[in-house]
Structures are given as C-alpha cells and as structure tokens.
Amino acid sequence: MKKSFTYRDGSFYLNDKPYTVISGAIHYFRTLPECWEDRLTKLKACGFNTVETYTCWNLHERREGQFDFSGILDIERFIETAERLDLNVIIRPGPYICAEWDFGGLPSWLLKYPHMALRCDDPLYLEKVKPYYRELLSRLRPHLCTNGGGILMVQVENEYGSYGDDTAYLQKVVDIYRENGIDCTLFTSDGTARWMLSGGTLPDVLAVANFGSYVDQLLTLKEFQKDRPLMCGEFWCGWFDHWYEEGRGQRSPEDMAGELNRFFDLNASFNIYMFHGGTNFAFWNGANHTGEQYQPTVTSYDYAAFLTEAGDTTPLYETAKRVIEERTGVKAPDVAVKNSTKKAYGKVKLTESAPLFGNLASLSAPVRAAFPKTMEELDQDFGYVLYRTELKGPFEELELFCGDIHDRAIFYVNGKQVGIKERSRRNDPIRIGLGFGETAALDILVENMGRVNYGIKLMDRKGILGGVRLGQRFHYGWEMYPLTMDSLDGLTYGEASQSGTVPAFLRGTLTIEGTPCDTYMKLDGFTKGFVTVNGFNIGRYFNPAGPQKTLYVPAPLLREGENEIVVFESDGYEEAVVKLVDTAILHG
C-alpha cells in the first residue's frame, strides 16, 4: 500500500498524521550483511523509527560501466531488512557523500579525465553520474514510500554549500532523480553557516542542517524556509580518528540527553550520526586535508556511536532510549537486544612467508613507461604501486627526489630498504651514488592511504606525481606494478623467519572449536600493512602512528575449524605472531 509522506506548516506528516523523524545512521557498506538485522533491530529497540544510509558510488562502480550490488553492497537487502522491522529509510545517494570514505564515495576513475570538473554542472561529470544513478535508482524505486516501501526521503548531493554554489548542478541532480521515478520527498543537507546554506539549497527542496552541538543552530533554517519542518540531517554524537592523532573523547550521556530533549522542545526531527559506525574495511577509508597536513582516517569507524564497532550498546544508547520514551510517550518495542560474545583466541603464529618482490607476477602485470604514472592512469583505485627502475653510474652521491608522493613511499636499493617518505611529514633525505660501470635496482613501493573526502583538495590522485629526480636530473624508464591486493590466492609461500625487513605476506592458521565469536586482532610485532581473514580484507594497521591498536574481526568472517590469516607487512616485523583478544583498543 502506498504511503504519503509530506510536510506543511512546519511539520512532517506520514499518512496525514504528524510525524517526527527519529533516525539513526547505519552504513550498509561498513557492516557485514550478516550483522545488518542485529544493528537495525537495536535501532528499533532504542525507539528510533528510521534508518539513514549513504550509498557509495566508488564500490558500486569500481570499474567504469561495471556495477556491483552484491554482498556487502546489496542495498536492496539492507532496505528490505529495515522494512521488515517496520523501520523507515532515508537514502543519501550523493553522488558525493564525504562520509570519511575514499574520495567521498566518488570512483577514482573519474580522475582519468583531466578536464572534468567534479560536483558541478559539467556535462562530462553528469554524463558519468547518470549510468550509476540509473542502476542505483532502479533498485531504490520499488522501495519508495510512494510505492509502498520504506524510503521516505532522498538527499540531493551532500553538504554542497561547503564546497560550491552551483545551484544549477543541484537542480540537475533533482532532474535526474525525477526522470528515474524518484517521486518522494527530496532534501539537501548543509552546515548552519549562512554561506553554506545559501550555496547548498534550492527553493523547492527541503533543507536540513548538520552539526554536533547547540541544537538551536537549527533555527537558522527558518531564515531560508520559514514554514518547513526543522530537521538535523546529521547530529554528530561522536567523531572519527586519524592516524598519528590521540583520538577523540566520549560524549557524556548527560550532554546527549540535553541535546535530544532540545530537539523535542523545538518539534524538530533528527538523524543521529552515527548510530552505528562500523568499519572502514579494506582500503576504503578517506582522509582530510583542510590545512597543510594530510590526515588519513583509521580503520575503525566506531565514532563513539550509540553502538560500538562490534554493535554493542553503550550508555548513549540507553540514554537515547529513555529520552525518546519520555518525550514521545511511546514505549520502545519489547525486542530482545543482546551484545555479541567476544573471545580471546590467543596467539597465532604466522609460519609461512611470501615476499612481495618474489610474487609480483602473481599479483600484477607490469606497465612500462618513460615517466611514472599515477594510480588512476594505471586504472587502479586502491592498494599500492611498485615503481621499479635501474640506475646506471657514474654519478656522485645525489639526493633522490619525488615530485609528490601520495601518500607513503618505501625506497629500496638492490632490495634493501634505504628510506621512507610520507606525505605532509618531515622526511629524511635519501642519497645514492654509483661509480663507473655500476648499476643499482631502485624499487619504490607507494601506498594509497586514502583519498581526500572533504574540502577543496578533493582531486587527490595517488602514486608518484611529478616524476623522480636524482639531484636536478629526471630519471626515465620505469616498470610499474599496480597492486590492488584484491586476490592473494596466487602467492607462493615458504617458511617464515621470525623477523623481516622486506615487504612480505605472512600466513598462519587460527583453529576454532565451536561457534565462532567476535574478536580483535593485535599485531604488536608488526609496523604497517593490512590483514585478510579467510580472504576478506579487515583493514589497515599502523602501530607506530596509532591511536588504533586492534582490528575488529567479526564472527561471520570466521568458521569452526581452520581459518586463514594473512598479514601484509610493508615496513618490517619483529615477531611473526598475532594475538586475538576480546577487547578493542582504539586509543592505545
């Protein structure tokens, strides 16, 4: 049966009855599908009536023209789960989403088009948006409230007023929605500064505001839309972490109670960002670069949210449940809510090793060019690039320069590590000299640590930008190995040593008796890299940088019996052992 969701005289109406949107953010792409029902059930049990999620173009269309809506990307299954639990849905399809997500959810292949302007009324950009929207919106359309589904609202772009003022572009996004049958309520969301709202709103589209404190900021919306409902599109209950930072604090339940009560005082709707944060699996995290410092986001997206990264309830959850019951007069559904069992499986020895340099053929085919290419020129979105060349003498000791490294490079001469250079950080010089008749193999392993997801430095190409010089002389003649690390099945392993200084994959087996439980992985003897569990990339670790010291291993990734753990260590390790513990360490 079709539903009616409208607004008038400062209020929302669902089927002609006054309605307050009490929403929480849960991103389907940050939580395993096996966990969606648990997280959504807890949202319902807390008294919420709506779930909000972004959609991530860069995973749904990793390769131009090739679409994927399976597994963790099965947005229809996520929506259907919410509908079955009688939750309404808010969808924020971008195309740009920010979200502390690589490139703000835009696919990296857009950067192959040098003359394309992003996030504006650029014909080429919109030409690339339309096929994605056709695929995505065809899946959303049956779930619109106007077709009897749960989707009440769909967002136009995302915080656009913080970036630009091309309202013609915003209208084009609206037009694409309407052409694809999206006939439900549309909205924009922006910060509360007037310059943000003036750049990011449209006269005929509902505007909502995003912030993390002082609810009365919402009243600024009245200057732009006097008779429309007040709504906070993102109320930030916590925050995210960057590598090299100490990490954010926890919001007090008392403070949260006061803010929630003020929303109800103003008859305002709200969306808690995040209700459940989840995880930046694989290489999907984004980065900030608003000043001079490049700041990549960590793997955990716990966000100090109402539910932890593992989906456990927190004091903020209990506070929200109490306030919502008191202010709505509706008792939260009597639904059994249970936190997952955590288990400390102990130490796992990684007994096998596959050196990166000896396994390149199984991971990638080389691309040859005179000048170093960027990841995007190599048709690569995530992972690493190995740049390989031969140096020939004679030349006196010269400093090795790279134009720009995005984002972290490890240098090897004849297989021996000679230095590391990292974007926006103070780096020691690397010097090389060769005599008559001497040659040297130079390898540069560059990691993409996450594309910028917010602000004016969004055009964040990866790899070596601007070439490599010895002193003042450019060096030409390169082999490049794009290393997406999508599949590690072809690696050839030998016996692992107890320590190592070259990049390598280390493999071991975790044996589980009985039903698997959630656990957390500590990698105390390791420096930097990523981990796969039974072939699934659970994300990056970076021990010297912190603050995150454990990686979340969700129970659905594990099985009774033998489980394969593969650690890729880029810098070098001191002990080939990982430890599975029962407590997360996010600020170690």
What is the predicted function of each stretch?
Residues Y28-A45, E64-T81, L398-L400, D404, ...:
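Aromatic- and glycine-enriched glycan-recognition loops and surfaces
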Residues K2, I91, P95-K128, R134-I272:
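Substrate-binding/catalytic cleft of secreted carbohydrate-active enzymes
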Residues Y19, V418-G419, I538-G539:
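Short hydrophobic beta-strand segments in globular cytosolic domains
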Residues Y125-Q155, D166-L170, V174, D183, ...:
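Carbohydrate-binding surfaces of carbohydrate-active enzymes
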